[in-house]
UniProtKB/Swiss-Prot annotation:
Keyword Iron: yes
Domain notes: Consists of three domains. The N-terminal SAF domain, which forms a beta-clip fold, is likely involved in the substrate recognition. It is connected by a long unstructured linker to the second domain, which serves as a dimerization interface between two monomers. The C-terminal domain represents the catalytic core of the protein and probably contains the metal binding site.
One of the Pfam families matching this protein, by short name: GD_AH_C
CDD domains membership: SAF_AH_GD
Associated pathway: Carbohydrate acid metabolism; galactarate degradation; D-glycerate from galactarate: step 1/3
GO MF terms held by the record: ferrous iron binding; galactarate dehydratase activity; protein homodimerization activity
Coiled coil regions in record: none
Protein name: Galactarate dehydratase (L-threo-forming)
C-alpha cells in the first residue's frame, strides 16, 4: 500500500489521495463537501461531492486515464475539469488483465521477522487442529431435513445444553444441496467437498453426526467419503440418522433418535477445556462486504497489517473473493512464493472467468448499488481496495472452493464474492475466526466461527455502535495509523479466539444460514 496523503481545508474537511500518481482523491467529510471548498494545494471543488466519492485533482481529458491506488481504474467518458465529482457513470470499465502474460513469483516478499510469544486459549483436537469455539455441529446430507434439524436444535438448546456447560452451542449445518442436482457432474465436487469439510471445521471438535432423509442423491455415506482430494470421515453408523428408516414411527421417534445421538456427542465435547496454544495455530479468514471507497484506505489495509502480524506468528490467513481479486491479479501473481503457486492463482481466475461466461455475464456484475453509493466506480476500484486485506506477505498456497490448507502462512482460497457463500466456503476451508470489513454496514455473522466486524468509517461505527467491533475510520482522519489499528485488531483476534471477548454478532446471535457454492447443474 502506498503512503496515504490526507489534505484538509479545515479540521473537518479532508480528502485522501492514495498514491503519488493518482489523479483522483476521495472526500472524507461525513456529509461530503460543498462547491467552493478550497484546499491548501489550490484545489477548489466546483460542485458538491458526497462522502467517499472521487474528486478530480487534475483536468482529465475525454478517454483519459482515471488513476487511483496508482492503477488505472477506468477511462473518462468525457472531459472532467479539476475539482469535479467523478461518479460511476463517468468511468468506462477497462479490460481485465490478460492472464497468460502475467509475471509469476517475480517479486516474492522477503519473510518478515517472526513474532514470538503470542498465544490464545483454544480447544485442541485429535487431528492437531485448534478450535476457538466448542460447538456441536449437526451435518445434513440434504435440505429436506432442515426443518427437523431446526426443531431438534431448539430442544437441544433448551433441554440438553444446560447439562453441558463447556459446550458453547449447537449448529444445524443446513444447506440447499443434496438432491435435485447433477450429483455426478464434474463441478459437483465443489458442494460435496464443501459440506464434507464443513463438518471437519476445528470448532466442531471432531464430533460428526449426519442427518439424512434416505432417498436423497447425496447419501450420508457418500458425503462422509467425500471426493478424491479429501480424507474419508470414519463415522460409526450409529451417528447417522435416516428419517425414512422404518424404525421411525411418527415424528417424535425421529426426534428422540437424533437427541440420543446428539447427547453422546455433547458428553464428549463437554470434556474439552481451553488450553494455551501458540498463535501459529490460528486459521483466520479475511472478508469484506458492503464495501465503499474507504475500504481500501482504512479497514482493509489495517486488516492487511494484522494479516502480516499473524503470518509472522506462524498462523494461517486466508483471503478470497475471486471477482474482487480478478482485476488486481497482476499485483498478486508476483507475490506467489513460486511459479507453481502463481499458476494456481491463474487457474482459479480462469475457472471463474469461464463460470461467469457460461452465465453470459462478467466481473462487471459484481458491484452493488451500495458499493456505488459508497463511492466505488466499478469492480476494478473495488478489487484494488479488496486485496489490501492480504497485506504484504508471500502467497504460499491457493485453494479451490472448499479445500483445506496444507501450509501455514498467507493463502488464497478461491470463493465467490457473495458474503454468505464466501463465509461458508471459508468455514469449509477450516477458518476458526473471521474478520469482516464493511463500509455500508451489514449484520452478517456465522454461528460456526466468531466474526469480527470492522467499520471503514467512524460515522458507521458510531451509528452501529453495537454491531461494529472495531472502528478503522480513525485512519481516514489521521487520529490513528494503519499500524495502530492493525495491532488493535491483532490483539482483538487473540481475545476473541480465547473466548475472553465476544463479537457483537455472537452477543446478539446474528448468524446467517450457510450458502454452499454449487456451480453444477440443478436438475
Amino acid at each position: 500500500m502506498a503512503n496515504i496523503e490526507i489534505r484538509q481545508e479545515t479540521p473537518t474537511a479532508f480528502y485522501i489521495k492514495v498514491h503519488d500518481t493518482d489523479n483522483v482523491a476521495i472526500i472524507v467529510n461525513d456529509n461530503g463537501l460543498k462547491a467552493g471548498t478550497r484546499f491548501p494545494d489550490g484545489l477548489e471543488l466546483i460542485e458538491h461531492i458526497p462522502q467517499g466519492h472521487k474528486v478530480a485533482l487534475l483536468d482529465i481529458p475525454a478517454n483519459g486515464e482515471i488513476i487511483r491506488y496508482g492503477e488505472v481504474i477506468g477511462y473518462a467518458v468525457r472531459a472532467i475539469p479539476r475539482g469535479s465529482w467523478i461518479d460511476e457513470s463517468m468511468v468506462v470499465l477497462p479490460e481485465a488483465p490478460p492472464l497468460h502474460t502475467l509475471p509469476l513469483a517475480t517479486k516474492v516478499p522477503e519473510p518478515l521477522p517472526p513474532l514470538e510469544g503470542y498465544t490464545f486459549e483454544g480447544y485442541r483436537n485429535a487431528d492437531g487442529s485448534v478450535g476457538t469455539k466448542n460447538l456441536l455441529g449437526i451435518t445434513t446430507s440434504v435440505h429436506c431435513v432442515a426443518g427437523v434439524v431446526d426443531y431438534v436444535v431448539k430442544i437441544i438448546e433448551r433441554d440438553l445444553l444446560p447439562k453441558y456447560p463447556n459446550v458453547d452451542g449447537v449448529v444445524g449445518l443446513n444447506h440447499l444441496y443434496g438432491c435435485g442436482v447433477a450429483i455426478n457432474a464434474p463441478a459437483a465436487v465443489v458442494p460435496i467437498r464443501t459440506i464434507h469439510n464443513i463438518s471437519l471445521n476445528p470448532n466442531f471438535g471432531g464430533e460428526v453426526m449426519v442427518i439424512g432423509l434416505g432417498c436423497e442423491k447425496l447419501q450420508p455415506e457418500r458425503l462422509l467419503t467425500g471426493t478424491d482430494d479429501v480424507q474419508a470421515i470414519p463415522v460409526e453408523s450409529a451417528s447417522i440418522v435416516s428419517l425414512q428408516d422404518e424404525k421411525h414411527v411418527g415424528f417424535q421417534s425421529m426426534v428422540e433418535d437424533i437427541l440420543q445421538i446428539a447427547e453422546r456427542h455433547l458428553q464428549k465435547l463437554n470434556q474439552r477445556q481451553r488450553e494455551t496454544c501458540p498463535a501459529s495455530e490460528l486459521v483466520v479468514g479475511m472478508q469484506c462486504g458492503g464495501s465503499d471507497a474507504f475500504s481500501g484506505v482504512t479497514a482493509n489495509p489495517a486488516v492487511g497489517y494484522a494479516s502480516d502480524l499473524l503470518v509472522r506468528c506462524g498462523a494461517t490467513v486466508m483471503f478470497s473473493e475471486v471477482t474482487e481479486v480478478r482485476d488486481a491479479i497482476h499485483l498478486l501473481t508476483p507475490r506467489a512464493v513460486n511459479e507453481e503457486v502463481g499458476k494456481r492463482l491463474l487457474e482459479e481466475m480462469e475457472w471463474y472467468d469461464n463460470y461467469l461466461n457460461m452465465g453470459k455475464t462478467d466481473r462487471s456484475a459484481n458491484p452493488s448499488p451500495g458499493n456505488k453509493k459508497g463511492g466505488l466506480a466499478n469492480v476494478v476500484e473495488k478489487a484494488l481496495g479488496s486485496i489490501a486485506k492480504s497485506g504484504k506477505s508471500a502467497i504460499v498456497e491457493v485453494l479451490s472452493p472448499g479445500q483445506r490448507p496444507t501450509k501455514r502462512g498467507l493463502i488464497y482460497a478461491a470463493t465467490p464474492a457473495s458474503d454468505f457463500v464466501c463465509g461458508t466456503q471459508q468455514v469449509a476451508s477450516g477458518i476458526t475466526v473471521q474478520v469482516f470489513t464493511t463500509g455500508r454496514g451489514t449484520p452478517y455473522g456465522l454461528m460456526a466461527v466468531p466474526v469480527i466486524k470492522m467499520a471503514t468509517r467512524t460515522e458507521l461505527a458510531n451509528r452501529w455502535f453495537d454491531l461494529m467491533d472495531i472502528n478503522a475510520g480513525t485512519i481516514a482522519t489521521g487520529e490513528e495509523t494503519i499500524e495502530e489499528v492493525g495491532w488493535k485488531l491483532f490483539h482483538f483476534i487473540l481475545d476473541v479466539a480465547s473466548g475472553k471477548k465476544k463479537t457483537f454478532s455472537d452477543q446478539w446471535g446474528l448468524h446467517n444460514q450457510l450458502a454452499v457454492f454449487n456451480p453444477a447443474p440443478v436438475t
